[in-house]
């Protein structure tokens, strides 16, 4: 057996057996004559020098491992404040929607997400995002492709504002136009005309706008409906500057929620206290003061009625405030009874009723003469003393006012002398006159 050392960096061990010695090769006591042993075994104990490494050829396995490591190694990403990219797309600002089957592009501007349109491919959506990013944030914005690809687009986008350029990008998308027309919201009808309709309005699937002879007219009808619905944010077929009238009308409608005032103010006794104004389909509580002729009764000086608000000029003279729409709402039976007592209590009877009736039937100054400037129909009318149709008039007035007839009849009879007493007074007066003459 002999041992041999080779080189500085390695140790070589050589074993040699003489073929003449039979049975000398045994393993655990068993013969191993057919076992073939290697002549030299080499083991590396120290690293190789640069010169020795250059001589040793690289194995195939090592080359494959190096190539795979280089392929999977990614350059360090630049830290930005734009947020992570979408999981469904490798491009920035692009998202795939399975419901629509399109690639949609969005960009954030001033804390709001702006929709740029839907596209068939992710590359088209990414280019739309790049153009919007350059327009909103300048040439230093983070984009998906190189800046040299948008040299011509940069020259064109300088002529548009942000809103106008967003409209241009949206019109380039495939989701902008559906149907047989090149305009949004326009479809060729089977009758040969162009049908205009707008979708997703007021919770409905679409709203029919009509049939038009030309495609341009239908497109303009859609634009007007979109502006009326969404205002300046509407997606239109043509430039929104051509619809200035619709935009002004839309801004005017948004400012129509104004405070209304009735302005029912007169003298000291007729000053009306107007509460908070309300729309025409609601009722407003109006409190007014009664005139002097009605203050003689024991009723309260203030009455409260319900009337619809209406714009009317102030009354110059003192008196009860009676709005034109007041006759549509009948008062309660208690208020009617009190008003009948006021008219009937005039001292001598006839003169008091006549004065109250004249005051009541006097036209109200400052109101229109269209039939609403007179007193309400439930007020009492003047009656001649001794008239026989008083009960019939009371019944008719009670029936028209909507409250029980017995209350008006009772109030009138209690404050008015009967016909028998009137006839007895006349006979006694005539007898006294005859005696005096004699």
Swiss-Prot record:
InterPro entries, alphabetized: AP2/ERF_dom, AP2/ERF_dom_sf, DNA-bd_dom_sf
Described purpose of this protein according to its UniProt entry: Probable transcription factor. Involved in spikelet transition. Prevents lemma and palea elongation as well as grain growth.
GO annotation terms (biological process): regulation of flower development; regulation of seed development
Cellular component GO terms held in the UniProt record: nucleus
Motif (Nuclear localization signal): 78-87
Native species: Oryza sativa subsp. indica (Rice)
One GO MF term attached to the UniProt entry: DNA binding
Cellular compartment(s): Nucleus
Pfam families for this protein: AP2
Ranges annotated as biased composition (Basic residues): 76-85
The protein, known as: APETALA2-like protein 4
Primary location: nucleus
DNA-binding region extent: 90-146, 182-239
Keywords for the protein's UniProt record, in alphabetical order: DNA-binding, Nucleus, Repeat, Transcription, Transcription regulation
Chain location of the short sequence motif EAR per the record: 258-262
SMART domains per the UniProt record, alphabetical: AP2
């Amino acid at each position: 057996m002999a041992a041999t050392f080779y080189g500085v960096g390695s140790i070589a061990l050589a074993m040699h057996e003489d073929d003449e010695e039979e049975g000398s090769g045994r393993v655990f006591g068993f013969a191993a004559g057919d076992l073939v042993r290697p002549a030299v075994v080499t083991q590396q104990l120290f690293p190789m020098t640069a010169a020795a490494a250059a001589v040793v050829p690289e194995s195939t396995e090592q080359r494959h491992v190096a190539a795979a490591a280089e392929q999977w190694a990614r350059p360090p990403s630049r830290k930005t404040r734009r947020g992570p990219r979408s999981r469904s797309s490798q491009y920035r600002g692009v998202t795939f929607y399975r419901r629509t089957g399109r690639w949609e592009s969005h960009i954030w501007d001033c804390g709001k997400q702006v929709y740029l349109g839907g596209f068939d491919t992710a590359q088209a959506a990414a280019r739309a995002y790049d153009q919007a990013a350059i327009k909103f944030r300048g040439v230093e914005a983070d984009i998906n492709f190189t800046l040299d690809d948008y040299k011509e687009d940069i020259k064109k986008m300088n002529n548009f504002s942000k809103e106008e350029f967003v409209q241009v990008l949206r019109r380039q998308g495939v989701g902008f136009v559906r149907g047989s027309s090149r305009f949004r919201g326009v479809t060729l009808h089977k009758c040969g005309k162009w049908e205009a309709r707008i979708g997703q309005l007021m919770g409905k699937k679409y709203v029919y706008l009509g049939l038009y002879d030309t495609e341009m007219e239908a497109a303009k009808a859609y634009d007007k409906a979109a502006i009326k619905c969404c205002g300046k944010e509407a997606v239109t077929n043509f430039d929104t500057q051509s619809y200035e009238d619709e935009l002004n009308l839309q801004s005017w409608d948004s400012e129509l929620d104004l405070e209304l005032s009735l302005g029912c103010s007169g003298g000291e006794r007729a000053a009306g206290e107007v509460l908070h104004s309300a729309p025409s389909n609601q009722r407003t509580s109006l409190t007014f003061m009664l005139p002097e002729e009605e203050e003689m009764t024991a009723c309260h000086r203030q009455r409260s009625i319900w009337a619809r608000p209406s714009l009317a000029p102030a009354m110059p003279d003192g008196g009860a405030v009676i709005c034109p729409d007041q006759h549509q709402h009948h008062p309660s039976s208690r208020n009617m009874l009190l008003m009948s007592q006021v008219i009937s209590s005039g001292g001598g009877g006839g003169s008091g009723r006549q004065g109250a009736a004249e005051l009541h039937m006097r036209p109200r100054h400052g109101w229109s003469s269209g039939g609403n400037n007179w007193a309400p129909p439930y007020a009492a009318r003047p009656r001649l003393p001794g008239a026989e149709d008083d009960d019939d008039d009371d019944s008719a007035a009670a029936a028209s006012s909507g409250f029980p007839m017995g209350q008006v009849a009772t109030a009138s009879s209690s404050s008015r002398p009967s016909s028998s007493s009137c006839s007895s007074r006349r006979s006694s007066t005539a007898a006294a006159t005859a005696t005096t003459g004699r």
